[in-house]
Amino acid sequence: ETVLVWCDRSQSMDFRSDMAPRSKAERAALLTLALGVLLSRGAERFGLVATEAEEPRTGERQLMRWAGILSAAPESAPDFGAPPPIAMPRVGRAVFLSDFMGPRDTVLPALTAAAGQGIAGVYLQILDPVEEEFPFAGRTRFESVGRLVRHETDQAAGLRDDYLARLAERRDELSRVARRSGWQLILHRTDQSPRRALLRLYAALGGA
């Protein structure tokens, strides 16, 4: 069988707070490469979407291509990411690793289109603990990694309930898309063990 993996390398994934040992991008790259190792050992054909290693192949050479791509900084990246259109083989699976925090009108249609091809798949949402807990109070300046979005407030704590409600809404939307298509949604924080996330991801793929 074939497994296609999309690893979000947008600027929002570069975020890392003091509460986490690694950025979202670093964690996504680690999990992507570790998954590639498992797929290689299982003699699966695997491809890395939107890269020169997108064509599914087997073996160590493909794994080395992945390692080279994931260890290099992208030449350019948008503020937020969404999976590009992909043509999935009928006997195949897909994995998307991202924070899925981009604009709703961009992210959700892209996920729906990919999931609507009749194949199994997994969404792995990777967030920093700060993005889940919103531990801010008083005067705070918020700025996206790409510096395209800025907001300053004297009452950060007052934004917490609205932010958490929006986060819950986004996760509900992801869950609905996953349920309709038979995909699975896995949540992971960058202050948690990557090993646990990898095991859950591999199990969701049926142990490949």
Task: Name every feature range the model reports, one short phrase each.
Residues 1-208:
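Exposed, interaction-prone extracellular/peripheral surfaces
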